[in-house]
Amino acid sequence: MSKSSTPTSARDSSTPLLVGACIAWGVATLLFFLLFTAPGEDGAQPDWFLTGINLLEIGAFFFAALLCFRNWRSSQIVSGRNVWFWIGLGLLFYAMGTVLFFIWGTVWGLDPAVSLGDFFYIFSYIFLAAGMFKAVLPRRLNLELPQWMMVVGIGLGGVLLAIFVNIAAAEAIAVPLGQVPAMHHLAQAPPDVAPAPALEAAPAEAPALEVEEEASSAPPLILQIDGMLEPLVDAVGLLYLIGDIVLLVIAGTLLVAFWGGRYSQSWKLIAIAAFCLYIADMFFAYAINTDTYVEGSLWEVFWTFSAIFFGLGAVVEHAVSVNSRRSPRRRRG
């Protein structure tokens, strides 16, 4: 028996444990969303629920980043160590962005148009795209026409879906706005009632002032930074859209380039992770554009699923790479 059999068997035994941990994390997240959701009368979720889903998402991205950095430190990874360094860095930045959004929204009660967390998200898209592109680049793609058409179709589908989300959001906003004049006239129909709302309007402003005071519990420096970043809201939204489409195109290319072969399974999982991220971002974009976003919606589970699939892809890639490098020496005595 070779002296290397002990560490090799340890690696083999860690693979099912890590795969099981990733799957269990995803199942636990889905069950938490389904079983413990408790929206109030206004549709908002309680703070303990928001804390729970944020911790599950942050933990999933940190865990997936560690698995990617594990591949980066291994000299046996077939797809290249730098590939997993950039993917791991992207996942780490995404986790840090979620931490900042949790602090801004749940701890400080802020809801700025642009915050520091947005920039961590944008950099995470850049790093993820760089890592996935490095995985495709060395393969010298010799795709046939149907395969290229599939990649182009995925890209066009992503662009059209993003356009549809924006158009649907604009129409959803236009419908209630069109109804406002009719409701306004109905309210003014009885002339005797007109002075009454005016008298009651003064005390109604008091709760609004209280809400503003409660929302300003963040440090003054943070409020100043949010005010400075607010003019960048359109540019940040455009960067998010470009990042989603680029990741979607690269994910489609990964599916085509790694469709068959021994090392295809890990990259199929990475592509699924990118698709999950895109799905969640499209739901988020629609909710933000229609001003109907409520943190803790069920579709947010796709963000955690994205981290889970990135982690699964890293585990499978490590297992396949280690087994392929040691297979010629397996029977050495």
Protein language model regions, located:
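Polytopic alpha-helical membrane-helix bundles and their juxtamembrane interface segments
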Residues: S2-G333
